[in-house]
Amino acid sequence: MKLPKGTRSSVYFAQHPEKEPLPSRQEVKQTPVIMAKIKGPGPAKYLRPSCTGYIDHDISMFKAPAYTLHSRHSEKRMVCHSSPGPCYLLDPKITRFGMSSCPQVPMEERISNLRLNPTLASCQYYFEKIHPPGERRAPQYTFGYRRPYRVMDLNPAPNQYQMPLLLGPNTPVSRAAPCYSLASRDKNWFYKEDVAGGPGPTTYARPEPSIYQNRSPTYSMAKRFAYPLDLTPRPGPGSHEVQQVTVHKPHIPAFTMGIKHSLHLCPLVIDIRD
């Protein structure tokens, strides 16, 4: 279908624009498919459901009956239980229709006859055990067991006290003769022996003469002040590397040889978080 001359650039809704012809098979550049460029979860992301146990079991697999084995309950577990337990005992005789029980008769002991006289008979008296009231008899005594000492009685016994000695000068109740002490001869009375028992004249330090005499003037000698210097750290002649200066001098081209890195290198994954 030919279009008018003035409307070659316009497109009608009733027709489709002409498609450009595709290049031949020789002109299409074949590039290998790199799986690392495909952004999506890998095959290990989707796991199959487990075939063991009863939680999240695979529905396509047969599942055997599962039983739970619990440990034996101890007395401590029953004691630590916070529920009130069977303290609310309901009477089994009470039903929703009321009391339901058979006739009951209480059985008690036989009551003694209150009309009988409790006076003792003549056969219940023992005359052989009674001494004649008009005759003399020897005194009778009762021997009981010895009372034990009190455990909390902490008083010392008589053998815990010692009598004072009667020998020597330390007698508080008797008169003692004079007592002398004899020392050994291995003690030499030299000039170094402290007989008086007090400090010597060399023990005390001699005071300064300025304390008890007229004090002369004193002066303090200080060090000489240094000239002000600029201590700012500055580089010396050996700090500059002249061989590396290439700003104003010609130099040969330099290349950096490194390692070829791949954009699709698998990184080291240490912590896996689902």
UniProtKB/Swiss-Prot annotation:
Repeat found in the keyword field: yes
Stretch list, region Disordered: 1-27
Gene Ontology CC: cytoskeleton
Basic and acidic residues biased stretches: 16-27
Alphabetically ordered keywords of this record: Repeat
Positions annotated as STPGR repeat: 199-224, 235-260
Keyword Repeat: yes
Family in the record: Belongs to the CIMAP family.
Protein name (Swiss-Prot/TrEMBL): Protein CIMAP1C
Organism: Homo sapiens
Chain's gene name: CIMAP1C
